[in-house]
A protein has these predicted regions:
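Short hydrophobic/aromatic-rich beta-strand segments that constitute the beta-sheet cores
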Residues: 77, 94, 128-130
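Short acidic-glycine-tyrosine-enriched beta hairpin
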Residues: 99-114
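Short, conserved beta-strand element in jelly-roll/cupin
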Residues: 80-94
Length: 139
């Protein structure tokens, strides 16, 4: 179909008109940085300062996407959500509760399923693109 025949907007499942202006382009987003650190009792090594640029939150509140930056350190993680990750920069090691480890480097793409428990260790300052889905009891 020629571009001239494509409708400029469509209706979403919620009946809201969605158009090209609804697209969230991370490179153009002007999202405020959220700075934080894990709770002290969860930190095992270093001072893992972290910054999130949460560029998108779904209207239902179950999905978000953005960019995460982490400084060297190791802390406990307990995922209640499903998270797709793409490492854009740096090196991290993800370990499960049994001590099994996976080294994560720039270019790696993976999903951490809800229920995963273990540690995240940043060896070299890390940048991660993420998409998070938090299921409810009905989804």
């Amino acid at each position: 179909m020629p571009d001239s025949l494509v409708k400029p907007s469509t209706y979403s499942a919620q009946g809201v008109i969605m158009s090209i202006a609804s697209i969230v382009d991370f490179s153009e987003a002007s999202t405020a940085a959220e700075h934080y650190r894990p709770a002290p009792e969860k930190v095992f090594k270093g001072d893992p300062a972290q910054t999130i640029y949460n560029h998108y939150n779904s209207p239902c509140g179950q999905m978000s996407a953005g960019v995460w930056n982490g400084e060297p350190g190791q802390w406990q993680v307990n995922y209640t959500e499903h998270e797709y990750c793409e490492i854009a920069q740096g090196v991290s090691v993800l370990r499960d509760e049994e001590g099994n480890a996976k080294t994560l480097r720039a270019g790696d793409r993976f999903v951490i399923p809800a229920g995963f428990k273990g540690t995240w260790e940043v060896l070299e300052t890390c940048r991660k693109i993420y998409v998070v889905f938090e299921a409810t009891e009905h989804t």
